[in-house]
Design a protein with these regions (language model features):
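Acidic, proline/glycine-enriched N-terminal capping motif
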Residues: 1-158
Length: 158
């Protein structure tokens, strides 16, 4: 495998990362349940992932095993900053990593993002998200100058 074949594909996604949770019953048709996403935030996040991929990757969809490295970025709450004249300064006690239940489990963030990369869900980077055979991910608060979203690196393994 040449260096060019092994080149990492880097995508910067801007938006609010949303976890893909369980499906919820939306109604019934002829006795069959109609399922939909339990979170309304998943669809906009997938659109953000698809748009970023379409704008930043122009190659053919990958059909080989890949590794996905993802860093999810979330806006910091006001409580992480000082007050008064220190309102723009980050408190020393402010955490770097996000552990809030409100923003979702890391595995569910990966699931929604991987779907946005795959052709089967309207993406353009992967033939199917089942091609992701290795994952490394973290979720953290934005640092100064960063906007919410994700840094994604996809590496061909074949």
């Amino acid at each position: 495998m040449t260096v060019a074949e092994r080149a990492d594909i880097q995508i910067r996604v801007w938006g609010i990362p949303a976890p893909q949770g369980s499906k919820a019953v939306r109604g019934y048709v002829n006795g069959r349940a109609i399922l939909g996403e339990s979170s309304k935030a998943v669809a906009p996040w997938r659109v953000d992932v698809r748009a970023a991929t379409q704008n930043q990757y122009t190659g053919p969809a990958l059909s080989c095993p890949v590794s996905l490295c993802a860093t999810f970025l979330f806006a910091r709450p006001k409580a992480h900053y000082g007050t008064g004249r220190n309102a723009e300064r980050l408190k020393e006690s402010a955490p770097r990593y996000l552990t809030s239940v409100r923003h979702g489990d890391l595995d569910k963030l990966i699931r929604s993002t991987a779907d946005g990369l795959s052709i089967s869900a309207g993406g353009t980077l992967l033939e199917d998200d089942s091609l992701i055979v290795q994952v490394m991910a973290d979720k953290r608060y934005c640092e100064e100058g960063e906007l919410p979203g994700a840094y994604l690196t996809v590496t061909k393994l074949n």
